[in-house]
Structure formats: structure tokens, C-alpha cells
Amino acid sequence: MVAGYINYSPLSFFAGENNMTTEEIFTGISTHMIIGVMIHKELADYYDFMSLAKYEKIQSKQYISESKSLRKLNRYFITRFSKLIPESRFEIPSVIPKDIYKHKSDDLSPMDVRQAVKRTLEMWVDWETKTKKLYEESYAELISNGDIGSALYISELIKDVDEELVEAKTLLMKNQHTDFDVVKIIEDQD
């Protein structure tokens, strides 16, 4: 069984764009955050399915935290600009492989768990790396546009994602050092 994928590039919002408006920047960030919340929900469900309680708790915490951040982002934009952030279309992320839905938890082999943990941790690090880059580019664009207040708001998001990225990279590295040994993964859940 193979972990899913995320077919989305947050940086596509800035591809070839110069002098984006604050509204366009916030639309890109909002869309990215919505997808991020969906990813953390799927990761939490997937880890719960594999009986990986610690990893499930980490992702549930991120799901709640990022849901709050998304709400704060919308509130910030509404109170500062008296407008709603426009909606945009996006592909729903696929984290849990479709064939998993045909199985029960006890159908999983140790190799299935090993591969799933490896791919999902790599996916998480990749996602948060892209998130940090998006926020940094958004910050720079807002500064360039003279919207210092919004840039300072985005700088708080950069700090948050930087902390999450450290956590994700540490967990990935810890598992890489043991070559994603399933016994070690299970022991780490206590």
C-alpha cells in the first residue's frame, strides 16, 4: 500500500506575478491554509487508523491550530479591509491512499506501516517547507507594496510554520536514523 500525494504547489500563486495586491496575496494564503487543514485532518485519521497515537495527536493538534489560524486570517482581512477573502478553486489533497479504505487496521503489515510513515513524514516536511516559502514570499510582496501591517501579520505565520517545520523535520530525521524501523515507530508512540 502506498501513501497518497498532494498535487498542489502553493508557489503557483506567485508564478510570474509582479505587484500582487494584498487581496490576491491573502487569497493565496487562505487557499493554502484550507488545504493544510485538510492535510492535517487526513494525516490524523491515517495515523489513528495505523494505531500511531502520538503521531495522531501531533496532527490533531496541528489541525486545530491551523483551523484557528485560518479563522484569524479571515478575521484580520475582514476587519482591516471590510471585505471577505475571495474563494479560489483547488484540488482536494489526497493523503490516504484510496485502496486503504477497503481494509481494516489489522490488515496492515509492518512494511505497510513503515512505508506509510516514511511517505507521510516526508510529505509533511515538504508541505511545511512550501508553506514557509509561500509566507516568506507573501511577506516580501506586502513589504514591497507598502502594506507593512499585513506583512507584520504574515510574519507571525512565518514564526508558527518555522516551529512546526522544526518538529516535522526532527520527527522525520529521528525515523530516518532507524531506517523507519516499525518496532521503533511503535515504541515512540508511548
Question: Where are each of the predicted segments found?
Answer:
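Iron-associated oxidoreductase/ferritin-like identity signal
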Residues: 2-190
